[in-house]
Amino acid sequence: MNVVRVWPFSTRTIPCTTTVAAWWTCCVTVTATGADKATDADAASSETLENFIFVSFIKGMVLFYDGLFRGTMIPRANRSITAICNTLRQAYIYTKIQSIAFERRLCFQNITYREVREIHEMYCK
């Protein structure tokens, strides 16, 4: 599967009304628009909700698995993907995300539905 590789900290946000099923479907089916590498600006300029969901999902997955979000770090009212990413925008985190992006090529076919649901609930409830 050809998956878009994007950089974190997009200026666009995903509404938390987006369903878990939509996150899951997008995670396992979204494909690139032809380019092997997409910049964050490219992703932010897209008109499709699916691309925004995918970008936000990637940010959430990287932060989740690096153990950078524990619920108490950011006020509950600000638990949006954008708020989390902006709060954790230190250079070493950005570098870490970039290295993960290159290593894994942001291809998450092996992520379970349960993990997607837990992340969605963590960020959006």
UniProtKB/Swiss-Prot annotation:
It comes from the Eukaryota. Partially overlaps PRY2. This is Putative uncharacterized protein YKR012C. It comes from Saccharomyces cerevisiae (strain ATCC 204508 / S288c). The lineage of its organism: Eukaryota, Fungi, Dikarya, Ascomycota, Saccharomycotina.
